[in-house]
């Protein structure tokens, strides 16, 4: 098994969303998180930069459902160079219009973390 090259942290919002998922979906989430932790170069089918933001998104596909998790590289502006990643919030993608609200939610969560820190 590969050694971890990235450490991941979860917000309470992410953990709450994850807790509500079925086992099959949780397994897919865990798989993508393992890739993020162990692969220096992560394929864009798993992580993409969100243009015009400071965030990336993790992509989790389960059947026809497309889940997204907004993530933040704590110690670098580049995801590939990052050693610490924060999973901010997750959602079931319904449309691209939804991203504006989810990005705002991610900013609020990140703001809370930078002001007081409640990493897990």
What are the residue ranges of the model-derived segments?
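Basic, Lys/Arg-enriched alpha-helical interface segments
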Residues: 1-66, 77-84, 92-120
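Conserved catalytic cores of phosphodiester-cleaving nucleases, focusing on short active-site segments
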Residues: 88
């Amino acid at each position: 098994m590969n050694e971890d090259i990235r450490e991941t942290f979860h917000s309470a919002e992410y953990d709450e969303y994850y807790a509500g998922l079925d086992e099959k979906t949780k397994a897919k989430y865990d798989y993508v998180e393992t890739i993020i932790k162990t692969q220096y170069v992560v394929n864009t089918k798993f992580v993409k930069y969100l243009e015009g933001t400071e965030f990336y998104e993790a992509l989790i596909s389960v059947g026809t459902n497309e889940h997204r998790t907004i993530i933040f590289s704590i110690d670098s502006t580049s995801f590939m160079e990052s050693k610490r990643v924060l999973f901010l919030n997750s959602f079931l993608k319904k449309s691209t219009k939804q991203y504006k609200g989810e990005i705002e939610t991610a900013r609020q969560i990140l703001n809370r973390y930078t002001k007081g820190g409640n990493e897990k």
